[in-house]
Amino acid sequence: RTDCYGNVNRIDTTGASCKTAKPEGLSYCGVPASKTIAERDLKAMDRYKTIIKKVGEKLCVEPAVIAGIISRESHAGKVLKNGWGDRGNGFGLMQVDKRSHKPQGTWNGEVHITQGTTILTDFIKRIQKKFPSWTKDQQLKGGISAYNAGAGNVRSYARMDIGTTHDDYANDVVARAQYYKQHGY
């Protein structure tokens, strides 16, 4: 099972903001921009597909969601230096922040992806407690937003991404995840 926390295909999304799309050299924004970026990362992502699917099964999270986060955080590792990014604070494909967590495993291995995905599920559970009336799919989106900016930043469904990087984190990740789901994740 990989659907314990909802289904990414049922989540509404506005996709990448222009602040996210422009540095990627795109003249357009929104879901089409997210899909283009996800597509550019697909070849690199496919190197980790087996591990991503294994961790998704183990933790009951859609592998496509894990892939969406990996694309957004590190372009499937393409922007990392010796496994580090974000000015030396973020570790690995999922950019686990060493200021909040002790990074585990190698930057691109199963232990790391398990740690990052566990951090995600912890945030989803916090959002479930904070917003019990939201649907599972809404709580999943809230958890994705919290993965970037913390559970305290999620104040309402409509505005959950305000305060995330480029104010579009969950919307962009969800759109990328929908792309990866169409490509066997």
Swiss-Prot record:
The family database entries (CDD domains) matched by this protein are listed as: GEWL
Could you name the active-site residues? 73
Q: What are the annotated disulfide bridges?
A: 4-60, 18-29
Q: Where in the cell is it found?
A: Secreted
User: Does the record's keyword annotation contain Oxidoreductase?
Assistant: no
Recorded GO molecular functions are:
lysozyme activity
Matching InterPro entries: Glyco_hydro_23, Lysozyme-like_dom_sf, Transglycosylase_SLT_dom_1
EC number(s) per UniProt? Answer: 3.2.1.17
- Keywords annotated in UniProt: Antimicrobial, Bacteriolytic enzyme, Disulfide bond, Glycosidase, Hydrolase, Secreted
Identify the enzyme class.
Answer: hydrolase
**Domain of life the protein comes from:** Eukaryota
By what name is this protein known?
A: Lysozyme g
Q: Which organism is it from?
A: Cygnus atratus (Black swan)
